[in-house]
Amino acid sequence: MAREKFDRSKPHVNVGTIGHIDHGKTTLTAAICTVLAKEGKSAATRYDQIDKAPEEKARGITINSAHVEYSSDKRHYAHVDCPGHADYIKNMITGAAQMDGAILVVSATDSVMPQTREHILLARQVGVPRMVVFLNKCDIATDEEVQELVAEEVRDLLTSYGFDGKNTPIIYGSALKALEGDPKWEAKIHDLMNAVDEWIPTPEREVDKPFLLAIEDTMTITGRGTVVTGRVERGELKVGQEIEIVGLRPIRKAVVTGIEMFKKELDSAMAGDNAGVLLRGVDRKEVERGQVLAKPGSIKPHKKFKAEIYALKKEEGGRHTGFLNGYRPQFYFRTTDVTGSISLPENTEMVLPGDNTSITVELIAPIACEKGSKFSIREGGRTVGAGSVTEVLE
């Protein structure tokens, strides 16, 4: 599919379908595209186009996920749908497809199932702020009392995981009937989009967040000082501003005396740019790859944190055997590896390839991280897992 010109006039929001296998996530994704295509707000996308999701790599991990685009009257959406349960877990933990909100699909014929719970928990852990519920297959489970009972169960479940279950919108629909063009059920897709427009918050743009650049390389320019290069992850940096150098060593401040991109001098660099930053009064020996430049006070170095991780299966290039408490791999944050030890939850003896679990990590050197920071777990240079920081401890 050719990328159309990106319409910047509407706010951009990333969403995704989550929920138990065969509850209708992919059918709903196809239905949204098909119904909105009638109004020219999406490209019509068939079920099999979404189901044959292409492979992509994120943090050394292969993930299958399908991406579609559509618009409502208010916003432009990028929507991700994953074919397999493991793909969802990998997607959420690696942040391969950022989700500003989710559409939770629950079948009215089955109610809440194990993956429903797991996806809600993961969404909570990785910081998805809100979700809208689509109660699917209401053309089959026509008994209104049954539908109400399922809706109540979903609300209770959302509340138990820290979401606002009481006020979360629940749309009663049939993805299949909407996909087939039945007007009664097509109307429910419009109801769903209105709920997504209203309930899922517009995310803060990356450029409006506090400045952060991950250092990839350092060099000395004779007579001018030290230059660090790297990609601006978020925010904006202007010449003359003071920044902090964070991670691996004690925090130190420095003033930016120049910014360069593609061999041109610039006044500023912003989110997404690869830039060289000239720092006054910093010796090259005092900065290194793996540190970050950041707006003062915006991020702290931490050695100990809690995380949600996914251990790669053997077929995915992961370990052939599980790992125990005290396992010491490398944790790759942004641009560098730091060794650390893993503590498993109380009743977990071992993490097997293909598992996802919560762990506590203690690194040998502090690294700039915060809730939501992503990392890879590596052993001898190969990726054996992926993780997302859920809480910083010290």
Curated annotation (Swiss-Prot):
The keyword Nucleus does not apply. One of its GO terms (cellular component) is external side of plasma membrane. GO terms for molecular function: fibronectin binding; GTP binding; GTPase activity; translation elongation factor activity. Residues 19-26 are annotated as: G1. It is an enzyme of class 3 (hydrolase). GTP binds at residues 19-26, 81-85, 136-139. GTP hydrolase that promotes the GTP-dependent binding of aminoacyl-tRNA to the A-site of ribosomes during protein biosynthesis. This is Elongation factor Tu. The gene is tuf.
